[in-house]
Amino acid sequence: MKSRRKEASKQAVDRFVDSARREFDAFAATLHGADYEKAASLILESQKKGGRLHVTGIGKPGHVSAYMASLFSSTGNPCYFLHGTEAVHGSCGQLVAGDVVIAISNSGETGELKATVTAIKNNGCTVIGVTGNPDSWLARESDACLFAGVGEEGGPLNRAPRNSILAETLTLQALSVALQAEQDWDPVRYVRCHPGGKLGQLREEALPC
């Protein structure tokens, strides 16, 4: 019995890895720099006027949002995590008219996110949607939309967010690269924001004496 379970587990992992590889290759082929121009432009124009960047999502995309807020911040674009459900219970108070909010939803139809995006727009903010459904409510309600779609999630039942999370993360990492390139973010500035850990050890080479 234990041997059969072990073999079933191995086969499940192998199937998921194959699925993730197929989805990654197919999705990566759809990524083009031009697709990010509008989103990056909206963020940069907002920053010039004192606006700030936020990221939000419900469920697993909410965890992607927290990671992306950290990544944007550490690469030259201060960014804030906006809790996907708390936003409609007072957390929209962190928003100021003219800010930009990136909203992540694979389906683009999640009820809680609809309420949050509506509140965001009512506070005078620009919305950049990230979704696997270009015909979704989120895509229609966004000022710019980035596609992050996959054909299957992988794993047992093909339901839990796996491959879609990889696509959403890759999409926003690409956006972070586009923004960082606009910021003239050199090693000195990077190390000043990231003095700890192995990356922080670069300070001896990067920082002036």
Where in this protein do the model-derived segments appear?
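General structural signal for secondary-structure boundaries
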Residues: 8, 32, 83, 183-187
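An N-terminal, well-structured beta->alpha segment
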Residues: 1-49
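Internal, active-site/partner-interface "lid" segment
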Residues: 137-140, 154, 181-209
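Residue-level signal for alpha-helical context at structural boundaries
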Residues: 38, 42, 61, 193-194, ...
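Glycine-rich phosphate-binding loops that contact phosphosugars or nucleotide phosphates
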Residues: 44, 52-183
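Glycine-rich phosphate/diphosphate-binding loops and the adjacent beta-loop-alpha structural elements
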Residues: 6, 51-54, 58, 198-209
